[in-house]
């Protein structure tokens, strides 16, 4: 209700992320992700405690900060107005006509011109399949986040 009142009266709105987890694990990610989605979709102007928090703010974790930055980047990409564009070119009416019911979209210029940047590219998440991930050392997300954190410091 607070968000609705703020929007109605044109007032700025602040909200915050939530994370009660004690370590940068699955619980910490879903708590942060869910609270950030709610904060962003409510129309908050500023979101406090959005990254790096554990144990309700009693612990500041560099690894969790890196992990949360990727969540924020993914949300930011999803909320990009281009994602929701419904103009004729964006929804590919000409490509749909060109492909018809028997073709495929990979050979169409509309797809080719957008393919490189149409998808979010994570800087932390590992999108390899299990076998490839295992062959590469089976490095868990917090470990990868720690390496990125160390690279930033150095």
PLM region spans:
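Catalytic-core signal marking the mid-to-C-terminal active-site face
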Residues: 63-154
């Amino acid at each position: 209700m607070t968000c609705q009142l703020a929007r109605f009266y044109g007032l700025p709105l602040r909200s915050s992320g939530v994370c009660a987890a004690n370590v940068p694990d699955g619980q910490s990610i879903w708590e942060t992700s869910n609270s950030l989605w709610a904060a962003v979709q409510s129309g908050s102007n500023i979101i406090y405690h959005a990254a790096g928090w554990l144990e309700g703010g009693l612990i500041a974790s560099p690894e969790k900060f890196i992990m949360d930055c990727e969540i924020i980047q993914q949300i930011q990409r999803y909320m990009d107005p281009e994602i929701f564009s419904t103009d004729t070119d964006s929804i590919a009416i000409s490509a749909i006509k060109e492909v018809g019911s028997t073709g495929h979209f990979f050979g169409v210029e509309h797809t080719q011109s957008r393919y490189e940047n149409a998808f979010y590219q994570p800087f932390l998440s590992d999108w390899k399949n299990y076998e490839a991930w295992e062959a590469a050392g089976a490095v868990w997300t917090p470990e990868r986040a720690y390496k990125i954190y160390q690279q930033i410091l150095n």
